[in-house]
Each structure stands twice: as C-alpha cells, then as structure tokens.
C-alpha cells in the first residue's frame, strides 16, 4: 500500500519530532518499545505489536535517516514490511507534516485484501497523532 497525507499541525517542527520519537506515544491497541537507542537517532530501533482482525502482529522498525526538524525515514520488518517517511516544515506558527507510507502485510496473498483496512488504520493513526501532538503542545504552553 502506498499512501501520502499532508496536514497542518498546531505545533512547531521540534515539537512534532519530539512526539514522533516518543516510543510511548502510540495509538490504542499498539505497543512500541525501544530496542536500541542511537545518539544520532539513525539506527534507533523499536519492537512493536498490534492486532489486525484480532490476530497479534509483531515487527521491528529502524530509523534509517534523520534530519533534525525536517525528516525521518523508517524501515519496517516483520508483520508490516516497507518504509515510512515523515517530513515536517514550518507553517504559519505550526508545521506542515507529510506522512508517506510504502508498506504491506508480509503475506502477499493476504496483503491485497487487507490493504483497505491497513489504509483506514493508517489514516486513523495519523489523525490520532495530530490530535495528541496538539493536545500535548497546548498542555506545555505557559498560562497567564
């Protein structure tokens, strides 16, 4: 499944990346743990699990490229194989975030049938992330 989605997020690029690098910031039904943390982010790897159609799926994601405040690229292995690219640029006091995914379920015959479910879950997770980043950012702003 290939998909791209661009949206405005009411948070700075630094805040967006801080959220994306937090392994505890995962949608309901998904867990993620840091397996290896690299000082320059590239090489950092995460183990993850989620359920699809009630069946637990597992895998590993590795950060393969990182330009602070601009771009992160991840490679997925296991139940989901492929790449994800997150590009962020300043936009009217917030950020314009582009999510690109080129991934598939690791079983080719099943993958084509599950692509519509995968796309829907991906879009829901992106919307969840936007809401969580904005909620987190608002809670960090000084009041007064």
Residue ranges: model-predicted function:
Residues 34-80, 92, 96, 128-144:
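Glycine-rich portal/gate segments that line the openings of hydrophobic small-molecule binding cavities
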